[in-house]
From Swiss-Prot:
NCBIfam families assigned: L6_bact
Biological role: This protein binds to the 23S rRNA, and is important in its secondary structure. It is located near the subunit interface in the base of the L7/L12 stalk, and near the tRNA binding site of the peptidyltransferase center.
The protein's name: Large ribosomal subunit protein uL6
SUPFAM superfamilies per the UniProt record, alphabetical: Ribosomal protein L6
Biological source species: Salinispora tropica (strain ATCC BAA-916 / DSM 44818 / JCM 13857 / NBRC 105044 / CNB-440)
Family: Belongs to the universal ribosomal protein uL6 family.
Gene3D superfamilies in the cross-refs: Ribosomal protein L6, alpha-beta domain
């Protein structure tokens, strides 16, 4: 059995979980998320209020989806209680970010400013001109938006200029050897 899938999911107080067929809806203080569980996997509520994810057999597809389904539901519960946040930093002379309402405007060495529109459920906050945060309740969406922003100007290996995740270590290369 899947070791992750076997674990029961604790449901904290203040979180309402509704199971309707294969659809799981989680409501909490930060919002509401819904997800449809793949077909062979079943989810039910135990007597102690925890959620259990089960699979009918040991087929390869069922094994693959077992741990995944459990983790997705657990991530939804964390999202509606605590939320998710990714921090990104900008390195480079003249590179900066400013908040324009709900959106972000970047100066990243292009001939024009780059504007990133906040999708529904995502909030941006700018701490410094070189440090900003992407936050929301959907872990997948937060990560996707952060990755798309990083993709605008990924860090280059020679000077490290660009947008990177906070704490990310950029593999550096030596420059040209030069003439002697």
């Amino acid at each position: 059995m899947s070791r992750i899938g076997r674990k029961s999911i604790p449901v904290p107080t203040g979180v309402d979980v509704t199971i309707a067929g294969q659809t799981v809806t989680v409501k909490g203080p930060k919002g509401e998320l819904s997800h449809t569980i793949a077909e062979p996997i079943t989810i039910d509520r135990a007597e102690d209020g925890q959620l259990n994810v089960a699979r009918p057999n040991d087929e390869r597809k069922a094994k693959e989806l077992h741990g995944l389904s459990r983790t997705l539901v657990a991530n939804m519960i964390v999202g509606v209680t605590e939320g998710y946040r990714k921090s990104l930093e900008i390195a480079g002379t003249g590179y900066r970010v400013t908040a324009k309402g709900k959106d972000l405007e970047f100066a990243l060495g292009f001939s024009h400013p780059v504007t990133v529109v906040a999708p529904e459920g995502i909030t941006f906050s700018v701490e410094k001109p070189t440090l900003f945060h992407v936050a929301g309740i959907n872990k997948q969406l937060v990560g996707e938006v952060a990755a798309n922003i990083r993709k605008i100007r990924p860090p280059e290996p020679y000077k490290g200029k660009g947008v990177k995740y906070q704490g990310e270590v950029i593999r550096r290369k030596a420059g040209k050897a030069g003439k002697k």
